[in-house]
């Protein structure tokens, strides 16, 4: 049910379509063939049928780990997508007889059915080869991020695994990371495998040549235009400008500004007219003619000084800016102001100067700069709106180079706001646009944006790949090396690899000792995990530089947080005081600045785990409760927090007894299942509680397994606002959303409601078919006291960071119920909500915060929400029906969930998924 939007599938009608599982396939399709297996084809022909070896070209470009399927033959990319070939059922039966799941999966992959291949691989024994073939299936399904993660993990264990190296190169090539792909093909070539090595050398050569040609062409144009701004005697580079009009137009304004005479400006007119023809309009030609009429006895000295600033990359002095204002040389003034972002000037000056000529390119440059200034002033919403308005205008004017740059800026701001799906989408759009135009520098900038969007989503393999490609494009540039390696150090620390993080940070410092705020953050953790004598001095120096730099409020808060965590290493009392001060200082920015929210989250996490480290377990409940915005519990509660390798859990017994446990030995990041995190001694204390309230700080909230299935427990979630005590509650209303007519393009089956008795009191309302639109559902829910969803959970990152519930489309095509939409409504009936949607509780992978549909429902006023963190089978309807009926019979939600969970684990075969159904209250 939960599905990526691009997953193949056809719409069906009626009740829930059965999920295809690997163990469904063989009994229905293969075992009949066993009856005639001994009369089948000869062994050689069997191999041809299974592995498609009877053709001169191979059917798949990636390599499988089954030796019979990994014979080299040339590969010819099909001009159009080929339909899958029928699998040989009789031959698959032979593999089934021998228990060869990997072979069955490989045959399905070769025959063009990666979904079936994945289903069989899920039941194959764990191995490196299985990981490789799972990566192949993901690659064929265009899930490159997933494929790269499988392959990188495999290659850490077996660096010379031939198939994995080959497949990694293919994935990187399809991601557009051609230099990195070429280097991996080099590794394959070095293995000396017949056929494969030669093809790998050809691939590497072709990839490098294509990148080198683009880089040389773009750099040639940039050099020609840059030199033109410094030497008025050079010829006008019309051919170079025609090849790369984006960088040419960007530099053309400086060429005009530095021209020493009217005649030289007039000589630039052919270049202006060429660029106008390409971009549309007459702005550059008009501007050139206008500047040619200026009095160059006054302008020439000012132009010469501007040329010096460009050459030396220096900001303009206040005196120079004053002289430009007095002379009325508006184009020079604008250029000097853009060279001097910290200049003190009237806030409206840039827009006033830009209005001196009718040039949308200049207007967009000014809007970009004004958005930057608004961001620094803490006006994040205004900055976002200004950039998006500029992007809209840019598209209208078809100024593609400016649009690519604005997309990258929007991506950066979205990353800063933890709108990570938007950040990735706009970053990738910038990358594609820049590649299409051959704008080398914009491509590199987009790679940085993509790397940051991936890093903040814990997508380590992709983030590392983007960073490595960025470095490969400028391997000898100090700033690039420093940037890449300090970010890789942060990635390694996210994986709890302190030695590797230290090594990356050392590489970052090879040409520049400063590693910025991110490096200071990393060093603060390394002082605990892998200390060096020089760390304290380095952190102090970085913080001094950070405090002296003009930054956004959120970045300033992050610097204060690093300072507080640094102090905490030396003195817990003083460090806690600083952390508390940081939390207070960040409060005004929490609604608008994600860096401020991250600061507060990490500050609370740090206070909690260090309290546990000090044995002050009685402090932990208050810290985590403050973080979550709920009252601190007194009894029958579990409180949990984690930060990096450290975890603290505290149990409050039925009489308020406090028992805690602190652990700092973890070597791997926590997974989605937290089973075993709470020691048995704490569980023993909690077993006598009728129900346990769990307060878990991000990133532990909304994960399964924190407590065992025999306990009645739920996650405590804060409401966004206090209920209105004087308002009369609405009458009982049972709302059911089922049989939804989702957009046909999603390929989702209709899901019927469960066969359950109606709500015992009050009215029932079912929203189904085309009537179950987001707006109608939200309106009905606002008065409901009991809500059931029988709908698909869908991952659509263009709509929400969390999974969404797929509903019927509105008139404008909107079909998704999102957590963001829930935050805008109030559920007046304090309903119990059953989310019969796959993975409705699955979390978006934020670095320090979490957000999910169930949390949004509770925040909007729901009394209790049931949801699963995994894909659930068709039988889930009966499970949720049982839970609801127990609640209507008088059980509390937590007790009802436990009772039904234990019944299913006892009586229903293959129901471990019930332990992944969580309750939020």
Regions found by a protein language model. Name each.
Residues 117, 147, 181, 383, ...:
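Single-residue signature of alpha-solenoid repeat helices
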Residues 103, 133, 167, 201-203, ...:
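Canonical tetratricopeptide repeat
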Residues 99, 129, 163, 199, ...:
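Residue register of alpha-helical TPR repeats
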